[in-house]
Amino acid sequence: MSSHTQAILFSKDLYDTKSARRWLMHHNLSPIKRVHDTTHFLRYRIREPNERYDYRTKILTTGIKAVIGCLPYAMLD
């Protein structure tokens, strides 16, 4: 696998825990831990981080970001 979703972040201005969990269920994502409640985001970890991957945060839609793990190009050979 060359990439995976490590976490999903929901803006607290637009989502509460109930609506965030509904979005996760609708997209077949299962958090492995309880929500990490920060100042601005609700963070749901989907997979444990792995040091072999480089991580990038991508905006999915208004109020939702995904942390994506990608193998470095050197490891894809």
Label the model's feature ranges.
Residues 1-77:
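Mitochondrial intermembrane space
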